[in-house]
């Protein structure tokens, strides 16, 4: 039926289609809607995965990652901090994460391990990024790149570390009702 036939038959016209910007059909953000820092986290995750799985040299990983399509849209300074800071501080990051794990590191997916490194590193060193943003970004990374329920594990670990690493900020959010106690 054409629009004229719909009117003649007494049918209601279809409502105008809503414009959805920045989302895919599944509701995930399109690449174009991601911030430069979100992109930096994605590239850092890919690079950290190469480090954890292949034990590749950080300099080689860095050069390889910078040549990937879309890297020019990422915040290169944030990527550098996440990649090199996580690799250099791996032992300290693991020491903070380990008490919250219910299994050995060897049993954790390298994706979830790398996402937790990113989260803990940002909690400690990127104080300009609110803790809830760090947590949400890491959950989104785990959803996009990790296993089926990996994001829940990442959420539990990072949510457990947030009060320890960002005590004043978490407490202020809890007092204002922005975060659960």
Swiss-Prot record:
Keyword field contains Transcription: yes
One Gene Ontology MF term: RNA binding
Example GO BP: transcription antitermination
Pfam family, one: NusB
Record carries keyword ATP-binding: no
Location of the region described as Disordered in the Swiss-Prot/TrEMBL record: 1-36
One GO term describing the cellular component: cytosol
Keywords: RNA-binding, Transcription, Transcription antitermination, Transcription regulation
Family note: Belongs to the NusB family.
HAMAP family tied to this protein: NusB
Task performed by this protein: Involved in transcription antitermination. Required for transcription of ribosomal RNA (rRNA) genes. Binds specifically to the boxA antiterminator sequence of the ribosomal RNA (rrn) operons.
Protein name (database record): Transcription antitermination protein NusB
Protein species of origin: Variovorax paradoxus (strain S110)
The organism's taxonomic lineage, starting at the top: Bacteria, Pseudomonadati, Pseudomonadota, Betaproteobacteria, Burkholderiales
């Amino acid at each position: 039926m054409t629009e004229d036939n719909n009117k003649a038959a007494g049918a209601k016209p279809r409502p105008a289609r809503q414009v959805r910007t920045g989302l895919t059909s599944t509701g995930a953000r399109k690449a174009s809607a991601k911030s430069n820092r979100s992109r930096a986290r994605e590239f850092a995750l890919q690079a950290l995965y190469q480090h954890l799985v292949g034990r590749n040299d950080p300099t080689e990983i860095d050069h390889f990652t910078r040549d990937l399509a879309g890297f020019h849209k990422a915040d290169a300074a944030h990527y550098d901090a996440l990649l090199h800071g996580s690799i250099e501080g791996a032992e300290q990051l693991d020491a903070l994460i380990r008490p919250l794990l219910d299994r050995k590191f060897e049993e954790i997916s390298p994706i979830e391990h790398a996402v937790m490194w990113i989260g803990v590193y940002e909690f400690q060193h990127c104080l300009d990024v609110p803790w809830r943003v760090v947590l949400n970004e890491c959950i989104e990374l785990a959803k996009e790149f990790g296993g089926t329920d990996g994001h829940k594990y990442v959420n539990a670990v990072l949510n457990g570390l947030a009060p320890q690493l960002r005590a004043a900020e978490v407490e202020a959010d809890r007092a204002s009702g922005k975060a659960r106690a």
